[in-house]
């Protein structure tokens, strides 16, 4: 049986007059959309428009909750309690669920954004709070989390379905964590390098670190960042490479 992978992309991150990403073009190549819920991007009109566009392309709807950090685009870590994390996720997932319901649709998944995602990947208490929030809003939702991280463990512990996420445009460290964006080798900007990494993760269940180590991981869903300059080129090229390799592409 050939392997399968979900292609997800962060979307709806524009805010007011400030525009981010090329959502409409990227939607034709992905199977899941992680839609910002107002705390790092995504005003109410953008949320509505992004849900409508995703539905028009048959793309699964996901909430993309963040720390309350519009100025920093949700990428700055801050100290929060598990209860605060729970409240943030319930509030944001509930908001997008309402937008989806107004268009006759339901959410499929939840993926935390930026610093909240990275913090919860390592912090078991935050991970448990996020997963509990997701389950309390809708126990049928899928939790997207960094492959092999505390988020995946927390979801499984409470019976929440989890999809292990890997990245096309980020390098990995020996512990399976993403290389911090502050480091010079964090981002992969060459499409051929990204494709090679993706195929290795999906087919072989492993990824090589910048210093040559091999790290095992499971790939259920692949993130393509919509805010990178070549997002459309990456989305098209990676999808074509997966299809040529006989890998099925479907929502997680």
Curated annotation (Swiss-Prot):
Signal peptide annotation: none
Gene Ontology molecular-function annotations: 5-oxoprolinase (ATP-hydrolyzing) activity; ATP binding
InterPro entries linked: Glyco_hydro/deAcase_b/a-brl, LamB/YcsF/PxpA-like
EC annotation from Swiss-Prot or TrEMBL: 3.5.2.9
Recorded family membership: Belongs to the LamB/PxpA family.
Classification via PANTHER family: 5-OXOPROLINASE SUBUNIT A, UNCHARACTERIZED PROTEIN YBGL-RELATED
HAMAP family per record: PxpA (MF_00691)
Protein name: 5-oxoprolinase subunit A
């Amino acid at each position: 049986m050939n392997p399968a992978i979900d292609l997800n992309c962060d979307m709806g991150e524009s805010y007011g007059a400030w525009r981010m990403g090329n959502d409409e073009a990227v939607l034709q190549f992905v199977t899941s959309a992680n839609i910002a819920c107002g705390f790092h991007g995504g005003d109410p009109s953008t949320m509505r428009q992004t849900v409508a566009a995703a539905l028009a392309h048959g793309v699964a709807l996901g909430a993309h909750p963040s720390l309350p950090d519009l100025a920093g685009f949700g990428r700055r870590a801050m100290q929060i309690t598990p209860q605060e994390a729970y409240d943030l996720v319930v509030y944001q997932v509930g908001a997008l669920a309402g937008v989806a319901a107004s268009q006759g649709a339901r959410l499929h998944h939840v993926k935390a954004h930026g610093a909240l995602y990275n913090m919860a990947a390592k912090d078991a208490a935050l991970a448990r709070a996020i997963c509990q929030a997701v389950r309390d809003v809708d126990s049928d939702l899928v939790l997207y989390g960094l492959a092999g991280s505390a988020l995946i463990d927390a979801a499984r512990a409470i019976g929440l379905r989890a999809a292990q996420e890997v990245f096309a445009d980020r390098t990995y460290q020996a512990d399976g964590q993403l290389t911090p964006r502050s480091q010079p080798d964090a981002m992969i900007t060459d499409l051929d390098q990204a494709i090679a990494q993706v195929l290795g993760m999906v087919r072989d269940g492993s990824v090589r670190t910048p210093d040559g180590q091999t790290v095992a991981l499971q790939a259920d869903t692949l993130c393509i960042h919509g805010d990178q300059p070549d997002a459309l080129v990456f989305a098209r090229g990676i999808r074509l490479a997966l299809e040529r390799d006989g890998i099925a592409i479907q929502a997680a």
